[in-house]
């Protein structure tokens, strides 16, 4: 295992920890701009989920429990880090392709529920690795 201290200190997308934390912070910012009740967010009508990036993100977050179990069974925490990096990549693609704060309340709340679920996964995955999940960067 080679640890690159210079890479670990960088604050850009080449640093996998920064990349994951940045996804978490981006989600925090969108939810902050919305300023609604996050506890009440849920997907109310799955028919609005049609975007390929949404489907990829849903698939990615659904794989979290299995990724954690496998990492624990194999004593391989790096697998969690690899999973989180892939999940963050799916989120960043979705973020770059999607408007979240839109007039259609149903679609907006479904999208916000999806990114909130993603934020939950990223935060808990980072926590398992002993890494912070900042809301701002």
Predicted regions and their residues:
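Non-catalytic interaction-recognition regions
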Residues: 1-137
